[in-house]
Structure formats: structure tokens, C-alpha cells
């Protein structure tokens, strides 16, 4: 881990099982274990889903904004709750109160902010927000569950 509470892509790849095209966290800008995490997703026109969402009016799919926030939640959980066993993962378990406030388009830099609320019996609850240029694009509460791989 970097000394200044950032995580580069190599460190993110060590924590998350996701790979292209579903790795949606490019870098962790700051975090404090058990408290919060701030990450970035650079939105490129080269993302494969922009071909169909929507032709002539590309918009980052809302469900993928939530997935990016969930991945940030997973990273925070990995860093906060302790080392997982080799056959364990954090699974996206629930989402509550999701709200979309503005579209995210190619060229945007999406800042993902997640705040740890609590952990009980292997289930972590976090509050998340995705922002572009300081404006909220999406907000939700998410849970991820620590489970053995199936």
C-alpha cells in the first residue's frame, strides 16, 4: 500500500476480482480504514457499452455507476474488516435509496465517495455518492457480504 493512503491500479487489482471491462475503479485517491474511501473512475468514450447506450447520445449506464460505487465499497471493506481467506470474496448484497441526479458522459471524471456505516456478521453497510465536477450524479446505501466463493 502507498504511504499516503492512495491505491494505484496494481493494488486495486490485488483487492478486487473484477477485470476489463468490469473494473470500474481506476485509482483510490484517499481512504481511512473503517471510515471512508475516495476513488476515481475516468469515463472514456472507448467504453464498450457506449456503442448502444445510447447511439448519438452516450450516457454512462446508471447501473454501472452503482457498480462502481459497490466496487469502491468492496475496496473499503477489504481494507477495513481484515484479510480474507483465499476462497472468500465480498459480494454486492443490497442497495437502498438509489437516486440519480445528473447524467455521466464520456470525458467526465467520476469521483466515488463511500463512507463505512457498520459491519456485522460479515456484512458491511456503506453510504456512497458519485460526483462529477462537484455535482452529485448518484447516491445510495450499499451492502456487501463476505462469503466463500461458489
Curated annotation (Swiss-Prot):
* Annotated coiled-coil segments of the chain: none
Enzyme Commission number: 4.2.1.59
Q: Which Pfam families match?
A: FabA
Molecular function via GO:
(3R)-hydroxyacyl-[acyl-carrier-protein] dehydratase activity
* Transmembrane region(s): none
Query: Could you name the domain of life of the organism this protein comes from?
Result: Bacteria
Cross-referenced InterPro entries: FabA_FabZ, FabZ, HotDog_dom_sf
Chief place where the protein resides: cytoplasm
* Reaction it catalyzes: a (3R)-hydroxyacyl-[ACP] = a (2E)-enoyl-[ACP] + H2O
The residues annotated as the active site are 53
| Keywords, comma-separated and alphabetical | Cytoplasm, Lipid A biosynthesis, Lipid biosynthesis, Lipid metabolism, Lyase
Where is it localised? Answer: Cytoplasm
Q: Which GO terms describe its biological process?
A: fatty acid biosynthetic process; lipid A biosynthetic process
User: What cellular component terms from Gene Ontology apply here?
Assistant: cytoplasm; membrane
Top-level EC class: lyase
What protein family does this chain belong to? Answer: Belongs to the thioester dehydratase family. FabZ subfamily.
The protein's job, in short, is: Involved in unsaturated fatty acids biosynthesis. Catalyzes the dehydration of short chain beta-hydroxyacyl-ACPs and long chain saturated and unsaturated beta-hydroxyacyl-ACPs.
How is this protein named in the record? Answer: 3-hydroxyacyl-[acyl-carrier-protein] dehydratase FabZ
Amino acid at each position: 500500500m502507498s504511504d499516503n493512503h492512495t491505491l494505484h491500479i496494481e493494488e486495486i487489482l490485488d483487492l478486487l476480482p473484477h477485470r476489463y471491462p468490469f473494473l470500474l475503479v481506476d485509482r483510490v485517491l484517499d481512504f481511512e480504514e473503517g471510515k471512508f474511501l475516495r476513488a476515481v473512475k475516468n469515463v472514456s468514450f472507448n467504453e464498450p457499452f457506449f456503442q448502444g447506450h445510447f447511439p448519438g447520445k452516450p450516457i454512462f449506464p446508471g447501473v454501472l455507476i452503482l457498480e462502481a460505487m459497490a466496487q469502491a465499497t468492496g475496496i473499503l471493506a477489504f481494507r477495513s474488516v481484515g484479510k480474507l481467506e483465499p476462497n472468500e470474496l465480498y459480494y454486492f448484497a443490497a442497495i437502498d435509496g438509489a437516486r440519480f441526479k445528473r447524467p455521466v458522459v464520456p470525458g467526465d471524471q467520476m469521483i466515488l465517495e463511500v463512507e463505512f456505516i457498520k459491519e456485522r456478521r460479515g456484512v458491511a453497510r456503506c453510504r456512497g455518492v458519485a460526483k462529477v465536477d462537484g455535482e452529485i450524479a448518484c447516491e445510495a446505501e450499499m451492502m456487501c457480504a463476505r462469503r466463500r466463493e461458489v
